[in-house]
Amino acid sequence: MPVVVQKVLLAEPRGFCAGVEMAIKALTWMTRVFPPPVYCYHQIVHNASVVAAFEAAGVIFVDDIEAVPSGARVMLSAHGSSPEVGAAARERTAVVVDAVCPLVTKVHHEVRRMAAEGYDILYVGHEGHDEAVGTIAEAPRAVTLIEPQRG
């Protein structure tokens, strides 16, 4: 027998996932330990007030790891990064804190494993989103991005 839902209530405010909470704590630690600027590869969270507070504390958010000066301190966001971005960060910076969410790390591991076993992988996500970019980069020949339908 189908269930009819008449009303859905959304909690306000909704909190961040555990991975983002961990990344926020890590970036807060970096702003306390290191003098500004501290760099963060991509915005730590899709929340303007949190990003603004970190910018006020001396964090510079970049969308290209090459924009981080040599010898700087950088955090990789909770959404995950491609292996190439992680390698470039470790090569050019003094300190790298990889704050990728453990659940994103698990997805990356599973994508690599399944690709190595010969599977074709369908990844449902949004083109250009940090999580999708990082995940697809783990096995680009094996992963096909599927954009969810809106509406």
Can you describe what each PLM-predicted range is?
Residues 1-151:
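The feature marks the mature, well-folded catalytic cores of soluble enzymes
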